[in-house]
């Protein structure tokens, strides 16, 4: 590397909030299945703690040696519903607690994979897991969950969407924050290192390391140097910056995998904000030329940003995967919080933005009296965007009891704060209650 490039990397870390957002170890649990849930839970605990015992130590070594912060160390596992074919909802809690205990034993921040894949229908394990979610997510601290309810190839499972709306509502009655640990996907990916949607897909190797980079602050600082330039210069600047960010992620991931004696999976290029000022995707969009995120032009600016990040990243790593785009979680992004508070950023605009970025309606507070069918309808709209456009979309929505539109809700830490946003009050219940399955789009038939 040239001296100038080395100095740029140092500045990115010290001044522009560049970090490795997560080093996530993916672990297959297919070989832990035993005759009864309690024994399977013991096997899960043993495998996770065996492989992940040095994850924290190795990540901290790399941090010290290279001066690059690694914010989170996490684990993802095989979707638990796949290994729980005969389980009841009560049985599922053995698995949830085994995951939670294992995560605490090795010291990671979160463990993902308390998940089900129901885009085409339910198996017994899927239903048991979904029915267990209100207890599983409120009785554990570090367990993250996801449910995939649609795909471009399979279509959309409207029965699952109805059930997930009821589940989100049920969770909100037990906890204000537990829904932050649940993502409802369309077109979920198998190698996502980010929470809460991470799980270890069945086509993955036994144990892998996946890395999620971040750097909204780095991109914003780079764009500050090209004020007034053409939009082509903006795109080129983002591409070059994403290249540098991804190189750092590639190096950290390869080192971590080598030292842990496991395979290196992918680098996820996603720009993931935090509530800290200067670490905001909204501020990047505003630097491109918007007075405030949510105004007209926001979707176009986000499309440009997302595309340029991907183009720069794929040149820097042969192993790009995960979600790889820009995240727009309202409560976790200082600029999004401001725009939502002022009414510039609405649910409708966020839905439009999800058509061109990762991932969806994310970390959005809505009134606690929002009906289950309205929540289901929001999930259905997001799924439709993902399924029709062959991309990942998701919903992580937070109905908060006792709140009304305009109230501020503090979720703490990286989860941030969010204003309660209005939802349309007209009912979608008759649509959701039809149930059944929305067929796959015509362009999914490619064989």
UniProtKB/Swiss-Prot annotation:
Record InterPro entries: UPF0210
Gene3D superfamilies (UniProt xref): 3.20.70.20
Pfam family, any one: DUF711
Subunit structure of this chain's protein: Homodimer.
Family membership noted in the UniProt record: Belongs to the UPF0210 family.
PANTHER family for this protein: UPF0210 PROTEIN MJ1665, UPF0210 PROTEIN SPR0218
Record-given protein name: UPF0210 protein LEUM_1180
């Amino acid at each position: 590397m040239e001296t100038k490039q080395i100095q740029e990397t140092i500045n990115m870390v010290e001044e522009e909030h560049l970090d490795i957002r997560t080093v996530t170890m993916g672990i297959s649990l297919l070989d832990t299945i035993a005759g009864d849930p309690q024994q399977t839970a013991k096997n899960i605990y043993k495998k996770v703690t065996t492989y992940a015992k040095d994850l924290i130590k190795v990540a901290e070594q790399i941090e010290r040696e290279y001066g690059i912060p690694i914010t989170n160390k996490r684990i993802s596992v095989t979707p638990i519903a796949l290994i729980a074919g005969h389980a009841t909802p009560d049985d599922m809690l053995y698995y949830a607690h085994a995951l939670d205990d294992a995560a605490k034993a090795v010291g990671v921040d979160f463990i993902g994979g308390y998940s089900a894949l129901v885009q085409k229908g339910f198996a017994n394990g899927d239903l048991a897991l979904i029915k267990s979610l209100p207890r599983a997510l409120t009785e554990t601290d570090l367990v993250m969950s996801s449910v995939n309810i649609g795909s471009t190839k399979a279509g959309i499972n409207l029965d699952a969407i109805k059930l997930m709306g009821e589940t989100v509502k049920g969770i909100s009655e037990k906890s204000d924050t537990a829904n932050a640990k649940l993502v409802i996907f369309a077109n979920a990916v198998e190698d996502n290192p980010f929470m809460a949607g991470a799980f270890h897909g069945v086509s993955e190797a036994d144990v892998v390391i996946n890395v999620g980079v971040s750097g909204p602050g780095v991109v914003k600082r780079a764009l500050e140097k090209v004020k007034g330039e053409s939009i082509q210069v903006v795109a080129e600047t983002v591409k070059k910056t994403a290249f540098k960010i991804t190189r750092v992620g590639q190096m950290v991931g390869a080192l971590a995998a080598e030292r842990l004696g496991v395979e290196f999976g992918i680098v996820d290029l996603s720009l993931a904000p935090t509530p800290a000022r200067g670490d905001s995707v909204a501020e990047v969009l505003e630097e491109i030329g918007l007075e405030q995120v949510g105004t007209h032009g926001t979707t176009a600016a986000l499309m440009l940003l997302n595309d340029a990040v991907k183009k720069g990243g794929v040149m820097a790593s042969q192993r790009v995967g995960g979600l790889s785009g820009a995240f727009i979680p309202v409560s976790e992004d200082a600029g999004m919080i401001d725009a939502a508070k002022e009414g510039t950023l609405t649910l409708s605009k966020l839905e439009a933005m999800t058509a061109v970025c990762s991932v969806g309606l994310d970390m959005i507070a809505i009134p606690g009296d929002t009906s289950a069918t309205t929540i289901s309808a929001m999930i259905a709209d997001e799924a439709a965007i993902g399924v029709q456009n062959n991309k990942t979309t998701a919903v992580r929505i937070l109905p908060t009891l006792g709140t009304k539109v305009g109230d501020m809700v503090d979720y703490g830490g990286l989860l941030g704060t969010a204003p309660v946003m209005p939802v349309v009050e007209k009912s979608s219940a008759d649509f959701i209650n039809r149930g059944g399955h929305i067929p796959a789009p015509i362009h999914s038939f490619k064989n």
